[in-house]
Design a protein with these regions (language model features):
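Extracellular glycan-modifying ectodomains
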Residues: 1-342
Length: 342
């Protein structure tokens, strides 16, 4: 028979406190603190309307501090840049393009067809090199999942086919770069530009294509050049769009090794024209990412391609209506796919 349990002394009972409650007073204190933070931020933002962030130290500090909290604590960007996984940043415009959100149309595709007709009358060839965007090659950094290939718009195949029907030679580098990403990184995590390794891979592919289809335009002699390796660190232009004041504090810097080449200069008399925007100018323009801000590093696409072809190129911005192509034999357009198919 089990012994009877001892009697409980009422004077020795344990007091269990009730669960804490969020009182009305505490709620008001939180609201007051939040309103105060917003008010201080608004004051500095109003001041920033009349001066830039760089000249308005207080506004710049407040913006930088608030963005640091949003990025580090809440994993949030701003209206222009979204945070992905593993420190990757993506421009909102690039996301909008792939989800068919509102975007601005352009006349690039129609302009290329017109340009091809002009060049054909002059017995010159138009060659378009299309480069995919960051999100097309690294979708898992924004939305986790297993991807068997690059993310494309349905319009891309149709637009490229129309260019080929117009007699334009098209190099769509999307699939090639998708395979190349297993060996090298194609784009930076915090910068919108391609890496020097990806740029060099495309220059090699284009050099091979030109030598096969236009052998007379490439030189068989090795040019005399002076090559120097430049080690550069940069926070990235996407980080600067989040925090212009102190971008490196958000996610740190990324590194790039540039091959600066002296001895291949642009030549307006060259039979080969190379058109391009930032894809072409990055690593040549000191004001762009990893450019150093001082003198031109001379490590961009035009320099690399000219070295491989063994001749100087007529380097220009994107095609304009009044451009002349007298005595030109080959016109190359280096374009982001987002410009070709917005």
């Amino acid at each position: 028979m089990k012994p009877a349990p001892p009697k409980i002394d009422p004077t020795k009972r344990t007091f269990v406190p009730p669960p804490p409650e969020f009182s009305l007073k505490a709620a008001r204190n939180v609201i007051h603190a939040f309103v105060l933070v917003l008010a201080v931020t608004l004051v500095f933002e109003v001041a920033a309307w009349f001066t830039t962030s760089r000249s308005n130290l207080a506004a710049g500090c407040v913006r930088s501090g608030m963005q640091w909290v949003l990025t580090q604590a809440l994993n949030e960007g701003n209206k222009d840049v979204q945070l992905g996984r593993e420190g990757w940043l993506f421009a909102q415009a690039e996301i909008n393009r792939l989800v068919h959100a509102k975007h601005d149309a352009n006349e690039v595709h129609a302009g290329l067809i017109k340009l091809a007709a002009r060049l054909k009358a002059q017995e010159a060839q138009l060659l378009v090199v299309a480069i995919p965007g960051r999100l097309a090659l690294y979708p898992e950094q924004l939305r986790p999942g297993q991807y068997g290939g690059p993310v494309r718009l349905k319009d891309e195949a149709e637009k490229i086919a129309a260019l080929k029907e117009a007699g334009i030679d098209v190099l769509d580098m999307t699939d090639a770069l998708w395979e190349f990403r297993d060996r090298e990184q194609i784009f930076f995590a915090q910068d919108s530009h391609w890496t020097p390794e990806a740029m060099k891979a495309i220059a090699l592919a284009l050099n091979k294509h030109v030598r096969e289809k236009f052998p007379r335009l490439a030189s068989t002699e090795t040019p005399i050049i002076n090559a120097t390796i430049l080690e550069r660190d940069d926070a990235g232009d996407l980080s600067r769009r989040l925090d212009l004041f102190r971008p490196s504090r958000l996610l740190g810097d990324e590194a790039a090794d540039l091959i600066s080449i002296q001895g291949i200069e642009p030549d307006a008399k060259s039979p080969i024209v190379l058109h391009g925007g930032e894809l072409m100018r990055v690593y040549d323009d000191p004001t762009l990412s990893f450019g150093g801000g001082d003198k031109p590093p001379k490590a961009g696409f035009a320099t690399q391609l000219g070295t491989l072809l063994g001749r100087s190129l007529d380097v220009r911005d994107l095609p304009q209506a009044g451009d002349a192509y007298e005595d030109k034999k080959l016109v190359i357009c280096l374009l982001p796919m987002a410009e070709l198919v917005p």
